[in-house]
């Protein structure tokens, strides 16, 4: 599996995880959901990028996506 395929798979898994989490938390308030979502995204991003320098740029991009997602949810 090359870097592009790994990156695509990671982003797909991340989106699936975020989507599932969001649906599970819809009963709670939006701000609680957003905070929980950020914690989960932080964990996933760190887990996926900690061992690979190739993913450092991805980590920055994902943090930006995370912030935008939060603003969009609000």
UniProtKB/Swiss-Prot annotation:
Q: List the disulfide bonds.
A: none
Annotated keywords = Host cytoplasm, Host mitochondrion
Q: Which domain of life is it from?
A: Viruses
Compartments where found: Host cytoplasm; Host mitochondrion
Against Pfam families, the record matches this protein to: Rota_NS6
One GO cellular component assignment for this chain's record is: host cell mitochondrion
Keyword Phosphoprotein part of the UniProt annotation: no
Family stated for the protein in its record: Belongs to the rotavirus A NSP6 family.
Quaternary state and partners of this protein? Answer: Interacts with NSP2 and NSP5.
User: Which HAMAP family does the record associate with it?
Assistant: ROTA_NSP6 (MF_04093)
Question: Which protein, by its recorded name, is this?
Answer: Non-structural protein 6
